[in-house]
């Protein structure tokens, strides 16, 4: 079943130019966007002061002098639409940028994956909300039909989600004909004919309509109703992810950048889904003011123990890292770059989940701990080529390279699960060492000698020993020519 989603951003000119929410909440008179000296759209505070679309600049200044007036910025709107399209790639690789702040997404093959159309629409709205945009959503079997339904006024009593072609025709028939861009130049002529809806427009003789209005109007009608093929220019996914976002105001604290970071992370997740990649490392730059006292960007480099593509995990790590950053200057822009990516591994085919979580789950936990506590405070053990048990390993940060792992001795006797920080001297009872009870040797001696090269020379004979309760210990006899009596030590406990 072919289902295309129409996504219209009715406030886009205002969203890319409006002042920060804190200014509006402080009681400002609001903001209005002008195009050629005429109000295109105004926010709620400006409307409360009487500002309406279509008013001229002079009328606005007379009615509400405190209203902030900004010129429409088509370049910023185009950038915002591309950012939304990039984020929507997580739902489908087929995303098209259309006219009048509207996007078309082919979600037919993705419906089952996202739990059906209602669930998919909820997830799309959540993605758009994370980007800071409100939207009107529609669904139809044709792209132009979805576009028309999404562009319908919020006050119109029209069903915006239509799955069957037959239902689409009946729904489109009720829409005003001037909603179709190709019909707007002829709005006066059509109104004079009493032609107000798309049904009225389709009822006109096609030959006469083509002579009067040209072939483009009929072609647009046919594409909307599914009577003609409609070519859609799907977005090309960029080969690399490197996105910069300017902040609406100067930010003095690192954690205040999180909202902007989320907008970039949402786009990153869409890009990863479209490219079928997982992220192994990324760089998040905080750009400061330029000029005579310019400060280089504050760069946060994040590397992951295992490649990931989870938005929540990215945000947790960024939040922990930003909480520990002291800014040298105010932030005016942020930039996110995927520096290392890997192909997505196929899902595991295990019937039952792995006890204790998967390798990816554990890796995410370690990354979160490193971000919160600092990389130098979360360590892992690495083997060292040394026969002495107390020197056979070292502690390294999680992301440190340990080099080639040291190989243990071939056919080495069993080693205890727990090694004491310092060997514990044992008392003697007769010829047997005692730890709670006399110990009985259960293995032959394993001689370990080394350390002459660093001044920590040891010479020991290790044994596995049992006490009377059956507990298992790792003990050694110190080999020393100067000792008058044998000296035994406890060095490890078996589990």
Residues covered by each model-derived region:
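A residue-level signal for conserved active-site and pocket-lining positions in enzyme catalytic cores
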Residues: 60, 101, 137, 201, ...
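Structured, non-catalytic alpha/beta "coupling" segments that mediate domain-domain communication
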Residues: 87, 119-160, 216-224
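A glycine-rich phosphate-binding loop feature that marks nucleotide/adenosyl-phosphate handling sites
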Residues: 140-148, 278-290, 331-342, 380-395
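Residues that scaffold, gate, or flank divalent-cation-dependent active/transport sites
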Residues: 1-104, 109-111, 118-126, 135-139, ...
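Short beta-strand-to-loop capping motifs
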Residues: 72-73, 105-109, 249, 304-306, ...
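Amphipathic, charged-and-aliphatic alpha-helical interface segments
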Residues: 44-45, 49-51, 167-203
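Mature hydrolase/peptidase catalytic cores and their serpin-fold inhibitory cores, especially
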Residues: 350-495
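DNA-contacting surface of Y-family translesion DNA polymerases
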Residues: 4-6, 63-66, 187-333, 342-350, ...
């Amino acid at each position: 079943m072919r289902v295309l989603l129409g996504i219209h951003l009715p406030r886009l000119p205002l969203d890319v130019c409006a002042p920060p929410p804190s200014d509006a909440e402080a009681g400002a008179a609001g903001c209005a966007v002008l195009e050629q000296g005429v109000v295109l759209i105004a926010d709620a505070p400006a409307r409360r002061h009487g500002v309406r679309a279509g008013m001229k600049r002079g009328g606005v200044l007379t009615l509400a002098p405190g209203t902030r007036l900004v010129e429409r910025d088509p370049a910023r709107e185009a950038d915002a639409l591309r950012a939304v399209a990039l984020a929507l790639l997580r739902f489908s690789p087929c995303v098209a940028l259309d006219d009048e702040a509207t996007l078309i997404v082919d979600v037919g093959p993705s419906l089952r994956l996202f739990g059906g159309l209602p669930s998919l629409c909820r997830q799309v709205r959540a993605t758009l909300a994370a980007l800071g945009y409100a939207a009107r959503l529609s669904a139809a079997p044709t792209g132009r039909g979805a576009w028309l339904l999404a562009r319908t006024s919020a006050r119109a009593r029209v069903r915006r989600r239509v799955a069957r072609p037959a239902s689409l025709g009946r729904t489109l028939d009720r829409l005003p004909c001037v909603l179709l861009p190709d019909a707007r130049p002829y709005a006066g002529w059509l109104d004079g004919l009493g032609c107000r809806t798309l049904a009225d427009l389709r009822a006109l003789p096609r030959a006469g309509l083509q002579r009067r209005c040209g072939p483009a109007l009929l072609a647009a009608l046919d594409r909307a109703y599914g009577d003609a093929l409609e070519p859609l220019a799907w977005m090309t996914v960029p080969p690399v992810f490197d996105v910069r976002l300017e902040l609406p105001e100067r930010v003095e604290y690192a954690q205040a950048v999180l909202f902007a970071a989320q907008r970039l992370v949402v786009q990153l997740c869409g890009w990863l889904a479209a490219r079928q990649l997982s992220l192994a490392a990324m760089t998040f730059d905080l750009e400061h003011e330029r000029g005579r006292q310019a400060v280089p960007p504050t760069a946060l480099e994040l590397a992951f123990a295992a490649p990931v593509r989870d938005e929540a995990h990215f945000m947790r790590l960024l939040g922990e890292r930003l909480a520990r950053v002291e800014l040298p200057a105010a932030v005016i822009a942020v930039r996110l770059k995927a520096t290392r990516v890997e192909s997505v591994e196929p899902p595991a085919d295990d019937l039952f989940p792995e006890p204790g979580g998967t390798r990816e789950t554990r890796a995410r936990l370690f990354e979160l701990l490193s971000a919160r506590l600092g990389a130098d405070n979360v360590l892992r053990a690495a083997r060292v080529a040394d026969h002495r048990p107390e020197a056979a390993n070292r502690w390294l940060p999680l992301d440190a390279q340990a080099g080639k792992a040291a190989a243990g001795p071939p056919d080495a006797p069993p080693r205890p699960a727990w090694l004491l920080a310092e060997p514990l001297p044992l008392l003697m009872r007769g010829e047997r060492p005692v730890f709670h009870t006399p110990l009985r040797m259960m293995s032959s001696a394993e001689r370990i000698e080394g350390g002459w090269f660093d001044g920590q020379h040891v010479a020991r004979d290790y044994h596995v020993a049992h006490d009377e309760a059956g507990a298992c210990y790792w003990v050694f006899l110190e080999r020393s020519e100067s000792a008058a009596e044998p000296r035994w030590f406890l060095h490890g406990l078996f589990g």
